[in-house]
């Protein structure tokens, strides 16, 4: 299957999977998915974009990896999704982020996800729980960026240059 067809399938799956899900800011959940997938600072390849579109499907919906594979999603994308899926009942957030740091594509998609989740302008009111979550997300972002700087310096430099750092 071509990369473009896989992207199209991923978008159809994500739209169906997140149908009728509304974020706290009132946006349909699919808007978050699209912002993550279109974050060109981090998400640079079609494989990463496909994973970004599907990044919350296995974790937050009834659809599993087997279903995605049956729909034509490649093993490369499924591997990234394996890293990105947080088993909240059995794995701490810290261990989940540590797992993500074992895969470059997962790190880049997660950075795009965290960037969107940290956009405080999307919330009507910021609670104490939100503030705590933002601290956790900032720490995760810092850890991932640190790993990028150490293990993938060229990619880190590219991101830093794009941000004017």
Language-model-detected regions and their locations in the chain:
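Active-site helical microenvironments for divalent-metal-assisted chemistry
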Residues: 1-165
């Amino acid at each position: 299957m071509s990369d473009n067809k896989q992207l199209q399938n991923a978008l159809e799956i994500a739209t169906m999977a997140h149908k009728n899900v509304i974020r706290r800011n009132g946006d349909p959940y699919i808007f978050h998915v699209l912002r993550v997938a279109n974050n060109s600072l981090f998400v640079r390849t079609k494989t990463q974009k496909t994973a970004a579109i599907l990044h919350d499907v296995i974790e937050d919906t009834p659809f599993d990896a087997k279903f995605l594979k049956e729909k034509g999603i490649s093993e490369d994308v499924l591997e990234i999704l394996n890293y990105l899926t947080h088993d909240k009942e059995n794995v701490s957030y810290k261990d989940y982020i540590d797992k993500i740091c074992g895969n470059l594509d997962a790190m880049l998609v997660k950075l795009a996800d965290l960037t969107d989740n940290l956009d405080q302008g999307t919330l009507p009111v910021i609670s104490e729980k939100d503030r705590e979550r933002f601290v956790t997300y900032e720490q995760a972002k810092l850890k991932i960026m640190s790993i990028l700087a150490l293990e993938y310096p060229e990619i880190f430099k590219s991101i830093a240059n794009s941000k004017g750092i």
